[in-house]
Amino acid sequence: MLLTVSGPPGAGKSTTADTLAATFGLEHVSGGDIFRELAAERGLTAVELNQQAEEDDQIDRDLDQRLRTIALERDDILLESRLAGWLAGDAADIRVWLDAPLNVRAGRIADREDKSISTAQEETRTREESEALRYQNYYNIDIHDHSIYDLRVNTARWPKTEVPDILEAAIAAYEPASDEGRFPIEDIIYDF
């Protein structure tokens, strides 16, 4: 089984992905973990590699290529990243998009990173705008198009302990034999 969990910063991807992976006996592969691996391979910290990525688009492409390769070549994976659903493409059994209003996500990020909510909100907005442009330019992906996702959950509506339960019920009920069709992923340029 290949599950993907995607969403913007602060939506609860990692928390939810950890729980889902444990429940379904899947290996949790995080885009953040792969980014840290890329940094280590280059003898850099994640912060240093992130700074380089601002000037060198090949760093993003290397990360995305590695995530796509994992999605296509490995079994029993939960792939978690902003683009996981897009990168896994039709190899994914279930694609999940988690989201929450910006003010809620900024509050979560502020708590996690020990900064003010206003700072977290402005940084998040700037980051999201930058990433949306890059994804469109690199791969022709409109990150605001959620039509490819099988499940979309506003994580602000339920306690964080309940969100995985909601998804677990839907995923456990999934029967590939009775699947009448997922939304295809079309016109994406996997140019790494």
Curated annotation (Swiss-Prot):
It holds the Pfam family Cytidylate_kin2. Keywords: ATP-binding, Cytoplasm, Kinase, Nucleotide-binding, Transferase. It is an enzyme of class 2 (transferase). Its EC number is 2.7.4.25. It catalyses: CMP + ATP = CDP + ADP; dCMP + ATP = dCDP + ADP. Belongs to the cytidylate kinase family. Type 2 subfamily. This is Cytidylate kinase. It comes from Haloquadratum walsbyi (strain DSM 16790 / HBSQ001).
